[in-house]
Amino acid sequence: GMNHLTKQAPVHILVVEERPNFTSGIGGLIKDKQFPLLDIGIAAAHITLAATAEGLGSCILGWFDEKAVRKLLHIPDKKRVILDIVVGYSTQPLREKKRKSADEVISYNKY
């Protein structure tokens, strides 16, 4: 696959979405927001931060063979596998990332 490093990772944390309950579903429709996906993003961020705090590396994968994962782990059809968070000890140091400056991505009191 696209992420050959994942084959050697000792831990895969799958994030599986369940259908929201009635109240959450209606709230999401009214507000035009997908609250379960927001919650999943928050949880994934905290998982990776916790891994880093323990000296582990992590990688959040959204592109994987969901059908194969679902079959392998007997995940019901009514649930969606949203993310695979791979956790393990890094074999290489983290490469320096090219990032935009703070001024390019942060604004105060206006967009």
What are these model-predicted stretches?
Residues 55:
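Structured binding elements
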Residues 83-111:
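C-terminal helix-cap and adjacent tail motif
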Residues 1-40:
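Glycine/small-residue-rich phosphate/adenosyl-binding loop
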Residues 51:
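Hydrophobic pocket-lining residues that define ligand/cofactor binding sites across diverse proteins
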Residues 68-82:
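Short, electropositive alpha-helical surface patch
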Residues 47:
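Aromatic/hydrophobic pocket-lining residues that form π-stacking "cages" and hydrophobic walls in ligand
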Residues 5-7, 75-77, 97-99:
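Solvent-exposed alpha-helices and their adjacent loops that cap or buttress functional pockets
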